[in-house]
């Protein structure tokens, strides 16, 4: 049975990278027990990360050293020991790398969030569409500072409309 250090996290994958590709790239470091590319449940599309588990811990360490920062399918990948975020001695390092991943995906959700509840909230007051989306996008997380500015934008727009 393999030890915990035999399982590697592989991040930054192209959405086109599959298990076969990862196995081909990592197999030169040793015998692989399992390869998993994590996919979205609904779309079945890659979420951009996966795991490679080696039979031998030393092979996994060699693969981590040899593959971290390399390019696979046009994307620079990150390779680290899986599950180390809960381990105190490497928690800071692991937290930093996963934090970058969260930042990337958070940006996508932020734009999606602006398109959902926020847009309809502004549509009722500002005439909606493009004008409603921009303030909602920028106000997410900073509602108080941008609330005044968007109100000012509406009063300017109202006075401009009165000329017509």
Swiss-Prot record:
GO terms for molecular function: enzyme binding; mRNA 3'-UTR binding; mRNA binding; ribosome binding. SUPFAM superfamilies: RNA-binding domain, RBD. InterPro entries: Nucleotide-bd_a/b_plait_sf, RBD_domain_sf, RBM, RBM3/CIRBP_RRM, RRM_dom, RRM_dom_euk. Residues 155-164 have a biased composition (Basic and acidic residues). Residues 65-164 are annotated as: Disordered. Residues 93-118 have a biased composition (Gly residues). PROSITE patterns: RRM (PS50102). Interacts with prmt1. Interacts with elavl1/elrA (via RRM3). Associates with ribosomes. This is Cold-inducible RNA-binding protein. It comes from Aquarana catesbeiana (American bullfrog). The gene is cirbp.
């Amino acid at each position: 049975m393999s030890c915990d250090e035999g399982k590697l996290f592989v991040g930054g994958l192209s959405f086109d990278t599959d298990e076969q590709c990862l196995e081909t790239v990592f197999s030169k470091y040793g015998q692989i027990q399992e390869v998993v590319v994590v996919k979205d449940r609904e779309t079945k599309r890659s979420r951009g990360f996966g795991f490679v588990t080696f039979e031998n811990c030393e092979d996994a360490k060699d693969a981590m050293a040899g593959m971290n920062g390399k390019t696979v399918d046009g994307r620079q990948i990150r390779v680290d020991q899986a599950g180390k975020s809960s381990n105190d001695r490497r928690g800071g390092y692991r937290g930093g790398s996963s934090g970058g991943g969260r930042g990337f995906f958070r940006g996508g959700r932020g734009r999606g969030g602006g398109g959902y509840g926020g847009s309809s909230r502004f549509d009722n007051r500002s005439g909606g569409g493009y004008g409603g989306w921009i303030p909602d996008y920028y106000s997410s997380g900073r509602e108080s500072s941008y609330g005044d500015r968007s109100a000012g934008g509406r009063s300017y727009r109202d006075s401009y409309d009165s000329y017509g």
